[in-house]
Structures are given as C-alpha cells and as structure tokens.
C-alpha cells in the first residue's frame, strides 16, 4: 500500500461539523490512516453548486509511520483509504434483506413486503488495483463493509463488479 499525496477516503469518514463522539476526520482533528500516518485536517473544499465536500486537505506527521507517535499522543479514530495512484473505479452491489418483515408468507401479497432498498448499487467506488490481477482470487474484504465476490461474467476489466456476500458488524452505528 503506497501512501501518496492524494488519497480517497469514505465520505462518512469526514464531517465539517462533527457530532459528539465522532472519532473520524474533521477540521483541526487528527486521525490515524490505517497502516499509515497521523493526519490532521487543515481545510476542505465544497462544490459551489451542491455544497458537497469534494476535497479534504490534510498535513501528515512523518514521525508517526505505522500509526504510532513517538511522543505518546493518541488519536481517537482510524480511517481507511486508497491511494489515488493505485486504484480503479468499480461497481459495488450491496444487498440487504429482501422483505420488510420476518415472515412474508403470512401476508396476502408478499410483493407488498419487498424491501425497496434491498439492493444498493454504488458506482465509481474506488478499489485497489490488485483486484485486476487474475491471480489475486475473486473474494475480497472491503474494510468495514464486508466480504465481496468479484463478478467475472458481468463486470469488465475497466470497471470490475463486486457483490457483497457477507456484511461485517457495524461498529460505527453505536
């Protein structure tokens, strides 16, 4: 994993106005990059039309390689990332429960109980380039999200397709 000058993080890992107990990146806050350094958010850029945050600027502490500070300071959050120089766009399909109730067979029409959010398709996801290597296998863990299987029949070399097969426990929902 190569840390370069431009990284991608999950949108949920940054907040311009964080709530209490938010242990991820925010203006003036320091977090640990998983397998990397401590970084501190110095500024961010928003899209003038939508207000959406499109860039987060940070400084890093070169003395914290490996995620530990020689001065003993601690950070409360660790976020994962992917280097912009070492990633590709992918389509990711997230599956949820098919029905909105536990026993759909007890209803007159089970079709009324289908969960409209049982499939979420996420396009333009960033994944490491290793997924393009045919010798790397077809099953991957995407940190904090779960285990995914590469769809070699419906995906493409340019934009691989992944299906989530198992979720991980959501420790962020506490």
Which stretches of residues belong to each language-model region?
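Short, small-residue-biased leader/transition segments that mark boundaries at the very start
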Residues: 1-3
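Flexible, glycine/threonine-enriched loop-and-boundary segments that flank and lead into catalytic domains
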Residues: 7-32, 36-40
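A structural signal for short secondary-structure junctions
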Residues: 24-25, 32-34, 49-51, 134, ...
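Hydrophobic/aromatic-rich, well-ordered segments within soluble, folded domains that form packed cores
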Residues: 32-46, 146-152
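Auxiliary tRNA-acceptor-end handling modules of aminoacyl-tRNA synthetases
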Residues: 95-96, 110, 143-145, 151-174
């Amino acid at each position: 994993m190569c840390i370069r000058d431009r990284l991608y993080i999950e949108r949920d890992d940054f907040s311009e106005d964080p709530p209490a107990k938010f242990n991820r990146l925010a203006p003036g806050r320091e977090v640990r990059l998983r397998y990397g350094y401590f970084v501190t958010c110095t500024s961010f850029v928003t899209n003038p039309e939508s207000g959406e945050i499109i860039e987060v600027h940070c400084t890093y502490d070169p003395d914290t390689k490996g995620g530990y500070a020689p001065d003993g300071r601690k950070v409360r959050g660790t976020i994962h990332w992917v280097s912009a120089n070492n990633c590709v766009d992918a389509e990711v399909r997230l599956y949820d429960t098919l029905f909105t109730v536990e026993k759909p067979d007890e209803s007159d029409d089970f079709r009324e109980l289908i969960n409209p959010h049982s499939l979420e398709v996420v396009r333009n996801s960033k994944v490491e380039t290793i997924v393009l290597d045919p010798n790397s296998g077809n099953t991957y863990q995407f940190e904090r999200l779960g285990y995914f299987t590469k769809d070699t029949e419906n995906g493409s070399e340019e934009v691989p397709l992944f299906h989530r097969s198992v979720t991980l426990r959501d420790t962020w929902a506490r």
